[in-house]
Amino acid sequence: MNPYWSALVRDLKPYVPGEQPKLDNLVKLNTNENPYPPSPKVLAAIRGELGASLRLYPDPNAELLKQAIARYHGVGANQVFVGNGSDEVLAHAFQALLKQTRPILFPDITYSFYPVYCGLYDIAHETVPLTESFEIRIEDYLRPNGGVVFPNPNAPTGRLLPLADIETLLSKNRDSVVIVDEAYIDFGGESAAALVNRFPHLLVIQTLSKSRSLAGLRVGFALGEPGLIEALERVKGSFNSYPLDRLAIVGGVAAFDDRDHFEWSRQAIMWTRQWLSRGLAELGFEVLPSAANFVFVRHPRHDGAELAAALRDRHIIVRHFKLPRIDQFLRITVGTEGECQILLDALSELVAGQAAA
């Protein structure tokens, strides 16, 4: 430990991102990236911005991107906040809205950045257990709190909370902010964005990383009542005035303008998810219902960590979590049909081989 570290840094437990291996010939199914390329219109927009304009700072407010997002979701531009990926947007939301006198609430099995933000910003929190079937039970959140935050679909389980349940939570929990983290909503769920004009304490956060194939561009955004958005803007203005570069802004605008490519990509992933889920079930895996671009699975007779290691030996990377309740599960990104077939073939050999042993 370095003697120059502050007490805050000494006590931090940073988020550990999914591995980005520097190897060739990998079937990479560990970080929920889209297996298909971005829209050609996005690539054309980025190429068009490559030139002398890069000597200039980008628009600090990214107004063109805010307007594109507002048009898509049917809200005002003053109801949109943009940031350098949804993680940055979440970080600003924790600072701006969730540092209250009462603890905030989030699921015990959820996106592991939430407790990291709480540690970094000294935010009191309590975790709420998921049910035995890994579902969020709304009534467990109907108690005094400093805010509620959860992903929908949940990560890493992929389970979807119906929009009607979110509406119930918002109706009965009006004294604190509710943040719905919708990184995966485009793969089968109904967005809570439809509720932002009815509930002034709702903030919806989304990303272009997953359904729009732009994880490398880093664009996230929030939708909410203008007062909530202003709070995020105040934090942003105290941290980084230019979170989005010129390429991210024009690429993001083009992504929202090309609805045909977006629809094709997400439909392909949803079809492959169903096909992959059936194949895994035929191999004896328990497959949780998923509305995301990944599946969460375990095998009743085979250890999760051992399966992940054996797949890695075959140059197939999936995500394994050494956490209570889910240490036997694998989170598997939905890749192309070809990638998923390679995975199924490898698992078939492993399951059969271990059963014979």
UniProtKB/Swiss-Prot annotation:
InterPro entries in alphabetical order: Aminotrans_II_pyridoxalP_BS (IPR001917), Aminotransferase_I/II_large (IPR004839), HisP_aminotrans (IPR005861), HistidinolP_aminotransfase (IPR050106), PyrdxlP-dep_Trfase (IPR015424), PyrdxlP-dep_Trfase_major (IPR015421), PyrdxlP-dep_Trfase_small (IPR015422)
Gene Ontology biological process terms, A to Z: L-histidine biosynthetic process
Modified residues (N6-(pyridoxal phosphate)lysine): 210
Catalytic activity: L-histidinol phosphate + 2-oxoglutarate = 3-(imidazol-4-yl)-2-oxopropyl phosphate + L-glutamate
Necessary cofactors: pyridoxal 5'-phosphate
EC code(s) of this entry: 2.6.1.9
A GO term, aspect molecular function: histidinol-phosphate transaminase activity
Listed Pfam families: Aminotran_1_2 (PF00155)
PANTHER family documented for this protein: HISTIDINOL-PHOSPHATE AMINOTRANSFERASE, HISTIDINOL-PHOSPHATE AMINOTRANSFERASE 2
NCBIfam families: hisC
Annotated family: Belongs to the class-II pyridoxal-phosphate-dependent aminotransferase family. Histidinol-phosphate aminotransferase subfamily.
Name of the protein: Histidinol-phosphate aminotransferase 1
Native source species: Methylococcus capsulatus (strain ATCC 33009 / NCIMB 11132 / Bath)
Gene name of the record: hisC1
